[in-house]
């Protein structure tokens, strides 16, 4: 699947706090989107959403960039493992 990478930094002094701060902003503006702050040495990353298609992620990316133009330059769609909700009564 796909997610939107909003932030990635390896500055050990500020990266974690920046990722968590930006996560809070996105959660307030888009509560329906899951957020994921991860640390894979040496990078702290903030990724958003669980999208099955690149097109679906791209549409969400447009909305995120409109809401947060100051962060738009760093935002991009990335391939990632995603969480898929399976609704009761259906099997996959």
Q: Where do the language-model regions lie?
A:
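Acidic/histidine-rich, surface-exposed loop or edge segments in extracytoplasmic proteins
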Residues: 1-10
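Short glycine-rich or small-residue beta-strand-to-loop segments that form or flank ligand, phosphate
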Residues: 5, 47-49
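Extracytoplasmic
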Residues: 14-45, 52-92
């Amino acid at each position: 699947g796909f997610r939107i990478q909003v932030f990635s930094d390896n500055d050990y002094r500020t990266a974690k706090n920046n990722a968590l701060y930006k996560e809070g902003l996105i959660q307030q503006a888009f509560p329906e989107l899951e957020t994921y702050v991860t640390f894979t040495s040496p990078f702290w990353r903030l990724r958003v959403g669980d999208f099955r298609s690149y097109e679906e992620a791209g549409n969400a990316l447009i909305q995120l960039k409109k809401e947060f133009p100051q962060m738009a330059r760093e935002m991009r769609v990335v391939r990632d493992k995603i969480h898929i909700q399976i609704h009761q009564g259906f099997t996959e």
